[in-house]
From Swiss-Prot:
Source taxon at top rank: Viruses
Protein name (Swiss-Prot/TrEMBL): Uncharacterized protein R895
């Protein structure tokens, strides 16, 4: 009936259950949030682009990235309190310490000092705390510096007569904050540290690098270690010495094996005095201000994300962020981008049962099963013919060759677990397959519509549209895959007739009767059943491109997909997405198609609890005849073109819509990308101590 019996294991490409399952990767990010974004003397500019205006974009970015551990630097007291209020409802434990100057280390609740802070936030669903502490970057690191006023006289650099601090050549003491956490899934301790290194003095940076790694390696006691933050490695001046000192003890993206993602640790601000230049391969010049180092772990992916003013909400706030007199035209919600890395435990990591004392206030309840497992799925319709090719000038500017860089950049930034793609030509699919394979994904492409037999793109040169399912190979293994046609006999391929203009005419104009009788072409739904190696559970995912014409055809297609996918997935979890075209406004579908699609599945509108993010499934292109309107709260009108629905998961926790933008012209791609982050049911899992 299908390509392969769902209960049959393909030995060649299915996971071997006799092997030891890998442990869930850990996503760690570092974000430097400058307390004073602009000169506060310019009151009007500061009001528009100070912290109160920037905070929503910072929150959106932290929400979007879905990190397990967040390292933060550069914030003042008010920012710390705001970040705590934002992160705690998402299940994070957040701790801050004084970052520098002659103040004793403390938590922010103990004092009202307004200097800069550093902090660590961790997901309580994934970790419980074992220990925490810190030390100073000075000759006697365990002795706090004197409690002296942090005034301008005291902060002068040594060469200008300032107080001798931090190994003698910088303007203030610096602090390292660390926490030792227990990873609940693996039962392995991991030590996490962060700091804000001094910006002045090569000697201080070199000595700080040596001290911090020696101390943290001793504290971690052979267990995995991560250290990151605003390390200010000006390697063009330092001659790589500080960086080489750090990498004697740990790795970053430049000396990690099997690493995918952006090969950079920081993208400089447009007119930042410490700006770094990016070449065509994404390689930075040797000034790396923000880095993440790791020891006893394997780097899987790295990425850079910016809280940008030019996202979905730009239209709502554009009058506020338009440059007044700011020549650098800042685009980010902070002076620096967020950097991140996904790390996997090495097989050699110790897997002993660790003795710990539970802290009831902020630790995981061990009487529960394993913490929920999160899956990030994205859906993107990448239109084949973006504009009329007869307009050669415009087509050359905004055709696929001009657009694909922004498509690949968007997917790399998001680093999703599953990617559903629609409306690609074979040449686009080949480009996407090469790109996705290179960053750790496997891809299955199939015919999307018209009267052509089912085949993968390697078997033919037909130029019709294709759909694709892509999965991260370190997370999933393929069990079986197949598809069916949206017609009365779904398992019978349509005839191999030419896909010409005459054949594609709608029925009312004399076209051939196809796809339940009221649209211009056959449509196809492809599916794949994958093994999630983190949970040992099978997940069925599917994608389709519904007919854009014909209410009856859309409704019958929804009924068929609902029935077929329920039969194919059985008791497995299901994720279904694509261009579903539920035109729910008056005179169209009247919610019938949407109701049928969600009859036994869920999207953001009928998720009962715990859902955060954009309350929208599609944001229309500005010239699209199916354009949807966005109100001030991000609510769409009832035309939802692109949808992701899911069944068998505990809840959808986040959704969002993004567009890969043309940086020079600020013109968006044809269709924004949509995404949902969902949690698998806790009772699907069996606790295993490796």
């Amino acid at each position: 009936m299908y390509d392969q019996d769902i209960n049959t294991i393909n030995v060649e490409n299915f996971y071997n259950f006799s092997k030891q399952l890998p442990i869930t990767p850990i996503r760690i990010v570092s974000y430097f949030l400058r307390s004073k974004f602009l000169d506060p003397k310019d009151k009007e500019e500061y009001k528009i682009r100070g912290w109160e205006s920037r905070a929503p974009y910072v929150y959106q970015l932290l929400n979007r990235v879905g990190a397990d551990i967040i390292l933060l630097q550069g914030m003042n007291l008010d920012q710390c309190k705001n970040i705590i209020s934002f992160l705690e409802p998402f299940g994070y434990n957040v701790q801050f310490r004084a970052a520098h100057s002659g103040k004793e280390s403390r938590e922010i609740i103990d004092d009202e000092w307004t200097g800069a802070f550093i902090g660590i936030a961790y997901s309580m669903n994934k970790f419980t705390i074992l220990n925490k502490g810190g030390f100073w970057l000075k000759e006697d690191p365990d002795i706090p510096p004197p409690s002296i006023a942090d005034n301008s006289e005291n902060r002068r650099s040594v060469e200008r007569g300032g107080t001798d601090k931090c190994f003698g050549d910088t303007h203030s003491y610096r602090y390292v904050f660390y926490e030792t956490l227990l990873n609940i899934e693996s039962n392995i301790p991991i030590t996490i540290g962060t700091s804000h290194f001094p910006i002045g003095g090569i000697n201080s940076r070199i000595k700080s690098s040596k001290l911090v790694m020696e101390r943290l390696c001793k504290i971690s006691d052979g267990h995995p270690l991560v250290f990151g933050g605003a390390l200010m490695l000006f390697e063009d001046k330092d001659g790589n010495t500080a960086y080489e000192t750090l990498t004697r003890y740990a790795c970053d993206y430049r000396n990690s094996k099997d690493h995918y993602g952006h090969q950079t640790s920081f993208i400089g601000y447009p007119n930042d005095p410490f700006k770094v230049d990016i070449n065509s391969n994404g390689i930075v010049s040797p000034r790396n201000l923000d880095l993440i180092f790791h020891r006893g772990l394997q780097s899987i992916r790295s990425f850079i994300m910016s809280g940008e003013f030019n996202s979905l909400e730009k239209k709502l706030v554009e009058p506020l962020i338009a440059p007044i007199k700011d020549s650098d035209k800042r685009q980010f919600a902070s002076d620096r981008c967020l950097i991140g890395v996904d790390l996997q435990f090495n097989r050699s990591a110790k897997k002993e049962i660790f003795q710990r004392t539970l802290n009831n206030e902020n630790s995981f309840n061990f009487s529960k099963n394993l913490s929920p497992k999160i899956i990030r799925t994205v859906n993107w319709n990448i239109r084949t013919s973006f504009l009329d090719p007869k307009d050669k000038k415009e087509y050359s500017i905004r055709g696929w060759q001009s657009r694909k860089h922004y498509v690949t950049e968007m997917l790399t930034h998001l680093a999703p677990d599953l990617i559903l793609l629609q409306e690609m030509s074979p040449s686009q699919a080949n480009d996407m397959k090469m790109f996705l394979n290179s960053i750790g994904y496997e891809v299955i492409f199939r015919t999307a519509h018209t009267g052509h037999d089912l085949y993968e793109i390697i078997d033919g040169e037909w130029t019709g549209a294709l759909t694709g399912i892509s999965y991260f190979r370190n997370r999933f293994f393929i069990n079986c895959h197949g598809g069916f046609w949206l017609k009365d006999d779904p398992h019978t391929p349509p005839p191999l007739d030419a896909d010409n203009a005459e054949n594609r005419r709608p029925i009312q104009e004399g076209g051939i009767d196809k796809c339940f009788g009221d649209t211009h072409s056959y449509r196809h739904c492809q599916w794949a059943t994958l093994l999630d190696v983190q949970s040992q559970q099978l997940i069925t995912t599917a994608v389709s491109d519904f007919p854009i014409g014909g209410k009856d055809s859309r409704l019958k297609s929804a009924i068929l997909c609902n029935s077929m996918l329920r039969e194919i997935s059985g008791e497995n979890c299901l994720i279904f997405g694509g261009e579903i075209c539920t035109f729910e406004d008056k005179g169209m579908d009247g919610f019938d198609t949407y109701k049928k699609i969600t009859e036994q599945a869920t999207d953001w509108r009928n998720t009962l609890y715990g859902h955060y993010g954009h309350q929208a499934t599609f944001v229309g292109y500005h010239t699209d005849k199916y354009k949807v309107e966005i109100d001030n709260h991000g609510i769409v009108s009832p035309r939802n073109i692109d949808i992701i629905v899911h069944r068998g998961f505990t809840q959808g926790i986040r959704s969002f819509s993004l567009s890969g933008e043309f940086n020079p012209s600020e013109k968006k791609l044809n269709k924004p990308l949509i995404s949902v982050v969902i949690i698998q049911k806790t009772d699907y899992f069996h606790q295993t101590i490796f």
